[in-house]
């Protein structure tokens, strides 16, 4: 289980996260909010790339800073088409990331083959990443996020800028990961997270304003017709701080 307790984060005088607390058991969670709501800050704190000014991030009751390098084997992170090396082939990139995760050379070929097959990228694995389409780049990022079979997966805008067919393909791969994993997905594409999310987390101006199932949220906010209408109703007047 992932637990955040009373997380705060400031950028100079601006409060990016304000007393954020969450408990996430295994399942898929959609993190929704407008630009500047605090999504990126929250994701970076969960991944350990950013330290909060206050509060704790716990994995199975242990603070992540106490886990050190062990946390790399627990978490998988796919940023929004960042951190890729265009000159690398997909296979070479995954080998590099597998090394950082501590996967042994003996296990590496089988593990890379597994994740490539999962995202349907086996045939493209020997091509330079610079020749990939946007959807292929996103799939290779998801492949590196699931190297080593992590129990916590963080995906930042996994379907942004993709065509409808590719978005469906990515969504299906994310849904198939659910089970014993905690999967946190930040997105603006409401229709991509609605069918697969266990719960939706709504964040506005650095505060968590609600967390519930899609059905309960839509009922709670006045019988709105789906999550997209709910999103527009809650966030259309948002005047938030920097993300």
Locations of regions flagged by a protein language model:
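Conserved ABC transporter NBD signature motif
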Residues: 55-66, 70-71
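Helix-to-loop junction immediately C-terminal to a conserved catalytic motif
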Residues: 47
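Conserved ABC ATPase signature
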Residues: 87, 128-132
């Amino acid at each position: 289980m992932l637990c955040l307790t009373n997380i705060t984060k400031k950028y100079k005088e601006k409060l990016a996260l304000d007393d954020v607390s969450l408990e996430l058991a295994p399942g898929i969670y959609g993190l929704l909010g407008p630009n500047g709501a605090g999504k990126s800050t929250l994701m970076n704190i969960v991944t350990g790339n950013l330290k909060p000014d206050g509060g704790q991030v716990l994995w199975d009751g242990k603070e992540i800073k106490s886990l050190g390098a062990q946390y790399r084997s627990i978490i998988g992170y796919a940023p929004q088409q960042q951190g890729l090396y265009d000159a690398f082939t997909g296979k070479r990139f995954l080998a590099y990331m597998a090394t950082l995760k501590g996967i042994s050379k003996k296990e590496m070929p089988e593990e890379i083959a597994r994740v490539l097959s999962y995202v349907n990228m086996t045939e493209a694995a020997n091509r330079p990443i610079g020749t990939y389409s946007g959807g292929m780049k996103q799939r290779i990022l998801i492949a590196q996020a699931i190297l080593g079979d992590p129990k916590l997966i963080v995906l930042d805008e996994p379907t942004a800028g993709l065509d409808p067919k590719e978005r469906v393909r990515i969504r299906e791969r994310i849904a198939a990961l659910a089970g014993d994993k905690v999967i946190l997905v930040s997105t603006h594409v409401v229709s991509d997270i609605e069918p697969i999310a266990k719960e939706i987390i709504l964040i506005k101006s650095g505060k968590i304003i609600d967390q519930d199932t899609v059905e309960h949220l839509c009922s709670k906010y006045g019988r709105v017709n789906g999550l997209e209408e709910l999103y527009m109703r809650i966030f259309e007047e948002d005047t938030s701080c920097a993300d």
